[in-house]
Every structure is written in C-alpha cells, then in structure tokens.
C-alpha cells in the first residue's frame, strides 16, 4: 500500500511571474510619502541586529505560521540540468525533476498566478551595498532555502510554498521534507549568493511574453534565478550567463529581473521582442524601464511604488538595514487599499552575507540568516 501511495504522489510546482498586486485591476494608492516614512524611522529600536542568527539544517523548521526555513547541502543536479540543454517549458523542468530527483515516482505540473514586488539597491555608510525586496501576494506559506551546492556558490533564496502542492489525495504536509526542498530549489523567486549578487524576478502586466528561439540552451524564469545564484559572482557575470541561454517565460508571463552586486551595479534586465535589454536602475517594480515604445507599461500602483522609493533614494544617499526595512514598509501593501499583502520583505546585506526577513508586514520582528 505504501508503495502504491508513493507512486500516486504528485507535486504541483507552480512557477509564477511577478505582477503588481494579485489583481489585474489595482485599487487606489495611498502609499506613504518620504516625510511620513522619516517620521516613523525613529519609532522604537526594533534593531534587527539584536536578533540571533538562525542556524539552519536539513530539517525544515517552522519559524511562525506560514514561514519556514531549511538548508540543503549537496548536489541538486543543476549542472546536469544545464548540460542536458536546460528546459524550454515548465513541463520540461517537470520531466527533469521527475527523472533525476524523484526516481521517476513523482509527476510535476506547473501553473501560474500573479503577484508583485518592489526592489531597491542602495549604499550603506560604510561603503557596502544593501538590496531590499518586497513580495506581494495573497496569504501563503513562505520557505527560506539555504543552498550549498557541491559546485557553485552558496545562497539564500525564497519560495512561495503555495506553488508546491500535493495531489492524489495527499496533503503537502505528508510529503517528505526532502522532496519539498528539492522542488523548492528550482523555484526561487529571489535570493542572494555568497558573492553578494542579488536576484529578483518581477512581473510586468503585458500581453507580450518571452520565448527566445535560437540554438542556445534553454531556461525558464525560476531556473534562471537558480542559475544566477549558483554561477554568477556579479552583475556582469549574470548578464553574460543570461546571454548564453534562450529564456522562456513560465506560463507566458512577461517578467524582468532586478540584479545588484557588491560594487553597486544595479540593473533591470528586460526582454522586448525577445531581445534582452539592460537598464541601469536602483529601483525596480512592475513596469518597463527600458526606453522605447514599451517604456512605462505596467500597473498604476507599480508607478506609485517606484516614485516613492526613487524619492527616498534621492533624499537619503546612504541607508542602513533599518532604513531599507522602513523603505520597504513604505511601499508594502498595507499602505494601499488592496486585499493582498506583502508576504515577505528582505534586506540583503551584500557585503556581510546577512539576510533579514520580515514576515507579513511585521516590521517589528526580524529573522536573521547568514550565508555560510
């Protein structure tokens, strides 16, 4: 019976692209201005650095309702995935994972949903750089994944575990943690590696998509994030890696990447008519930033969030981790008449390898992690 049940297990790995908010029609914007933000920055100590650094193991640990973390050390077959040509579709990723990571016993299916985010890159007073990230969606289960591959850079990334579900009458909680972790390794939505390279995927609400068709190897959106975290030390290396592959947007959704490194390089990578376009920018939300006919296409709320963060960066040339937290708070979903929420906010300390997480807009409580 156990053997029969194991053959019925189905993981549904939902690879989503990022959109501003979870609805196609966004509600009115009431985001905080910079003066209101600055008045709040002095409220309470709320020092994230006072929190203990969380040590992770291969045992998945629940930190609070809807927020867990795990560590994986070893070979999760990324090199094999790339060497065999990558994947030009979510179904192809499914086939690879089924064959190489689940002994052919599991079947993966991929679906898409809409969600949004904001990112910003800024220098600290000590000369190092910080990268902030908000993930906006419905209430979900978030998983922090610390990865230490045999070949590649160590990293910390985040996965929406609502994108991994169990079928055949089994609940996700009953699946082995290692199976869930393996699937999550191929579904990062953001992250930073030991070299300080930060990567985030943001959706652009547009009818166009990305389907590059040349003789290059193929990658999908979240496998591109995993590729960059494992193989790129800085923005230049990340861009060169992306040029080596044909990108295929999962579920046909238009995306752009926000990349930032320890030298202060911060760019948006967009695909217009299947051509990669790179724009220098410290702030990325959910509209096209490249000059041309697509410039500005996106949601109204994403423009509001972009304007708030851009104004903050002009007024405050350097920021520390608390400032980044407050900046992310200023564009979180509780500032808008929006039924969705900011499920997680992250402050990446690119110089030290520290990562601070804030869950569901509770900016009073930080979870500290450190790469290696």
PLM region descriptions:
Residues 252-290:
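Extended amphipathic alpha-helical segments with heptad-repeat/coiled-coil character used for oligomerization
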Residues 229-232, 237:
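Short N-terminal edge-element motif at the start of the domain
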Residues 237-250, 257:
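Secretory/export targeting leaders with adjacent low-complexity proregions
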Residues 5-24:
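Sec-dependent N-terminal signal peptides of Gram-positive bacterial secreted proteins and lipoproteins
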Residues 143, 210-213, 240, 268-272, ...:
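A short secondary-structure junction signal
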Residues 20-226, 230, 320-372:
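N-terminal mature-domain region immediately after signal-peptide cleavage
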Residues 1-3:
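N-terminal secretory signal peptides that target proteins for export/translocation
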Residues 284-325:
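Charge-rich, low-complexity intrinsically disordered segments
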